[in-house]
Amino acid sequence: MNFNSFRKEIYSGNASVKELVNEFFLKIDSLNPKINAYTCLTKKIANSQSENIDKLITNNQKLPSLAGIPIAIKDNICTKGVVTSCSSKMLKDFVSPYESSASGKLWSLGGICLGKTNLDEFAMGSSTETSVFGTTSNPWDVNRVPGGSSGGSAASVAAGLCLAAIGSDTGGSIRQPASFCGVVGLKPTYGRVSRWGLIAFASSLDQIGPITNTVSDAAEILYSISGKDNLDSTCLDKPVPNYLSDLDKSIKGIKIGIIEECFDHPGLDPEVKESVLSSVERFRSLGAEIHDIKCPRFNDGIATYYVIAPCEASANLARYDGVKYGYRSEGESNLLEMICKSRAEGFGDEVQRRILIGTYALSAGYSDAYYKKAQRVRTLIRSDFDNAFNEVDVLLTPTCPTTAFLKGDFVNDPLSMYLSDLLTVPVNLAGLPAISIPCGFDKKGLPIGLQLIGNVLEEHRILNVANIFEKDAEVMNTKPNIEI
């Protein structure tokens, strides 16, 4: 179901918004024990919001743009009066005293908050297996991961447990789970959406964005949460276009660049490659011009990212010491011992690993060899993208090298896990917008996603190209069969 079909249910008058929203809660109560997409539900908040919309309908008043739309929020985005845990023992009982800018905009436009969704601890992971609440299951095969770190958000949309979910994307954390779960995931330009209220992982890379069933729904959510915010100094003061207005525009003559380095990589699954290249031919038949493009440093992105992101994480997570808030170890004899034990017990293995990597890379005598060098390579990666966009309008790659893998496959092999982000991290390093859309299935029936990358602030262009593909491809209408 998309937004427009849900609106028809509202306008039909056969059921109130509150009744329609409660149907989602009934489905969540039935399916969440199997999928583990939600960490907590906000039924009281949702009922209050629903009643407000029903009053507007009763009084024949104009409805706000997202009136009645059931939305889930990733649990690293602050929601006032609700636990915001980052799926970590460190913040398991932390109740946010304020609302994030992005979620606040959604509620002001009539959106309904269903609850918070599961993620890899502090958004560090590609499988949602590092959560203190347990692993989320992929709705297409509950023995497989949904991707990460926004695995709960993607799984909730794919399973029909909400109509849209908000995630965060630091190195692919919206797009990769969207690909694994067969839904649409959009990472906006860095600064397009305010990060106020997003608990920081890597501040120069983090970006909030939507996960939805359709491209048009993603466009609507993006329009709703974008724009200048004085509470976030990195938020861009640029006009926000109506992303819905150009969705159906013909893509005849648009230049799509195929990044050669992505398709030549030995880690790319042949079935994924075949499906994405088949989609390239579909774009050609729709009138797009296809060009081969070289981005020589694209595959250096993964190594660059796994220096820069842990460095920023080690600084951002230094605040969690058990003194002011967060998990606190009891019975220690002095302050230093209490801080050390609180962090050792409060953070999971993957978070501790990245803190150690980041602290080492920033330490005296090593920052030149690692952090500063990685920042120079980051500049070169951005330069490659600039050169590519001098030749084409949009870039195309697979979203992920593989389809969803089995739970436990890479828990003890972090380097292999990191490679799941191979094709997404360069986009974050360059601060560009990108969208993942379903393009096919492998022989196991698992979704395959393709990634469209745009130039800075050209979300409207990738949304247009994605929407035309969506309307032409029947794969978008296929949903997982989850037994209640």
From Swiss-Prot:
Residue positions of the active site: K74 (charge relay system), S149 (charge relay system), S173 (acyl-ester intermediate)
Record-linked InterPro entries: Amidase, Amidase_CS, Amidase_dom, AS_sf, GatA
GO biological process, one term: translation
Top-level EC class: ligase
Protein family according to the UniProt entry: Belongs to the amidase family. GatA subfamily.
Primary role: Allows the formation of correctly charged Gln-tRNA(Gln) through the transamidation of misacylated Glu-tRNA(Gln) in organisms which lack glutaminyl-tRNA synthetase. The reaction takes place in the presence of glutamine and ATP through an activated gamma-phospho-Glu-tRNA(Gln).
Protein name: Glutamyl-tRNA(Gln) amidotransferase subunit A
